[in-house]
């Protein structure tokens, strides 16, 4: 997945005028001789927006569809001795990265919902 670049700091969740949402994560400030701005990963999420829908979209963009099932099958095959034990570590590594992503998405989504609630109260 390629990083996206912007001259201004992006919001983590943004509703587009077309009705879909943009979710951005791993936002990093970039400073070098050619560019000062921000880089991040970005996915398009279609309504209705939920943390699980964001996570599913991110997983599909990062690893592709059905990758989780394939890694689980390889893991089980390694447990049964059909594949070597390296597949166990590959699956554990995937689960750790997925867990970290889920925690980030959940945190960002809670903050987004709170911001939306605050805007409704302040109207």
Regions found by a protein language model. Give the residues of each.
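A preference for well-ordered globular domain cores
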Residues: 2-123
